[in-house]
Curated annotation (Swiss-Prot):
Organism: Homo sapiens (Human)
Subcellular location: Nucleus
GO biological process terms, semicolon-separated: negative regulation of transcription by RNA polymerase II; regulation of transcription by RNA polymerase II
Zn finger region (C2H2-type): 82-104, 110-132, 138-161, 364-386, 392-416
Region of interest: Disordered: 223-247, 262-356
Lineage: Eukaryota, Metazoa, Chordata, Craniata, Vertebrata
UniProt record similarity statement: Belongs to the Ikaros C2H2-type zinc-finger protein family.
Tissue expression per record: Expressed in brain, heart, skeletal muscle, kidney, and liver. Highly expressed in THP-1 and M-07e cell lines, which have characteristics of myeloid and early megakaryocytic cells respectively.
PROSITE patterns reported in the protein's UniProt record: ZINC_FINGER_C2H2_1, ZINC_FINGER_C2H2_2
Protein name listed in UniProt: Zinc finger protein Pegasus
């Protein structure tokens, strides 16, 4: 009871001194308020507080409401965001707003110590340093492409894999669901032929230049990785039961992605006789009926979507074609096992991958070059080298060859002079 309570004036003086320091700090950052004027206002408020011995509500109101400034030196909008003093930009975080202000001031504090590069954003400097170190942390889920910047990866997905939604059409799978399935990390190489059947009709066509350019550089990886992973993960009893396991993170499933985007093309674009497009590869129902052959299952998983009814394939044109076998006409399910299917190579000079001895009926056949291969992608690229009207006319440069030997030598030399 005998102790004396501390004077509230000491607390008020300490707080006024703290406010004075913060006000000077605000003036140094923004430059919008005169430091002397604020100091005088605070001193006047301090004298009133000393005389009354009360708290300082007038000081708080002056800082928050009248001046519209905070201790960090930025104005706030009605929803509480920090506002740029040069434009109408607003941000919730101070760091983001400071980076934005550097656009107006031209300040670039983040500089590379190896070259003259400078940036206003720290993340841009981090991406630039990867060009010196060679680090490429961003990888495409659909192929072996790697890059050092996220924006380059997005550009690659749009340009190579056609991941932009088609206007005026409806895909069989929603874009969010498709992305979720494609980005699902799994170690199993599923039997994606079954998923491809449900994605698009058999009459879908693929633009030849994009198709050839997308997959030519990925052929070596497909030959080794797909067969090894299939031999370890695919059960000998048959197909996987989970449909989401059918679309996994491997280079072959970019065909499935392309098929899903082109599944609802208008009918006028589905002209198999056009020389600018490449029809779908052969759709043999026996491929689905032979799941026990693991190596062939891995190769077939990269094929373009086929008919949803494996027992009743549609008839094929009888014209000399680049992507179809001469026996690709209508056939029943039992007869498909005895017919000669068609698979080819990317070029006549490229040998077939080293595979175990297989039944010739499980290999795709090029009737022009008399070659058998078990990879459907190589077959499609190889058949694209044949001319549409003349099978021994180079489809790249237009050179007319005499026979299959002259045709093979022409591609072995690699001299494609435009005529």
């Amino acid at each position: 009871m005998g102790e004396k309570k501390p004077e509230p004036l000491d607390f008020v003086k300490d707080f006024q001194e703290y406010l004075t320091q913060q006000t000077h700090h605000v003036n140094m950052i923004s430059g919008s308020v005169s430091g002397d004027k604020e100091a005088e206002a605070l001193q006047g408020a301090g004298t009133d507080g000393d005389q009354n011995g009360l708290d300082h509500p007038s000081v708080e109101v002056s800082l928050d409401e009248n001046s519209g400034m905070l201790v960090d030196g930025f104005e706030r909008t009605f929803d509480g965001k920090l506002k740029c003093r040069y434009c109408n930009y607003a941000s919730k975080g101070t760091a983001r707003l400071i980076e934005h202000i550097r656009i107006h001031t031209g300040e670039k504090p983040h500089r590379c110590h190896l070259c003259p590069f400078a940036s206003a954003y720290e993340r841009h400097l981090e991406a630039h340093m990867r060009s010196h170190t060679g680090e490429k942390p961003y990888k495409c889920e659909l192929c072996s492409f790697r890059c050092s910047d996220r924006s380059n990866l997005s550009h690659h997905r749009r340009r190579k894999h056609k991941m932009v939604p088609i206007k005026g059409t409806r895909s069989s799978l929603s874009s969010k669901k498709m992305w979720g399935v494609l980005q699902k990390k799994t170690s199993n190489l599923g039997y994606s032929r079954r998923a491809l059947i449900n994605l698009s009709p058999p009459s879908m066509v693929v633009q030849k230049p994009d198709y050839l350019n997308d997959f030519t550089h990925e052929i070596p990886n497909i030959q080794t990785d797909s067969y090894e992973s299939m031999a370890k993960t695919t059960p000998t009893g048959g197909l996987p039961r989970d449909p989401q396991e059918l679309m996994v993170d491997n280079p072959l499933n970019q065909l499935s992605t392309l098929a899903g985007q082109l599944s609802s093309l208008p009918p006028e674009n589905q002209n198999p006789a056009s020389p600018d497009v490449v029809p779908c590869p052969d759709e043999k129902p026996f491929m689905i009926q032979q799941p026990s052959t693991q190596a062939v299952v891995s190769a077939v998983s990269a094929s373009i979507p086929q008919s949803s009814s494996p027992t009743s394939p549609e008839p094929r044109p009888s014209h000399s074609q680049r992507n179809y076998s001469p026996v690709a006409g209508p056939s029943s399910e039992p007869s498909a096992h005895t017919s000669t299917p068609s698979i080819g190579n990317s070029q006549p000079s490229t040998p077939a991958p080293a595979l175990p001895v297989q039944d010739p009926q499980l290999l795709h056949h090029c009737q022009h070059c008399d070659m058998y291969f078990a990879d459907n992608i190589l077959y499609t690229i190889h058949m694209g080298c044949h001319g549409y009207e003349n099978p021994f006319q180079c489809n790249i440069c237009g050179c007319k060859c005499k026979n299959k030997y002259d045709f093979a030598c022409h591609f072995a030399r690699g001299q494609h002079n435009q005529h």
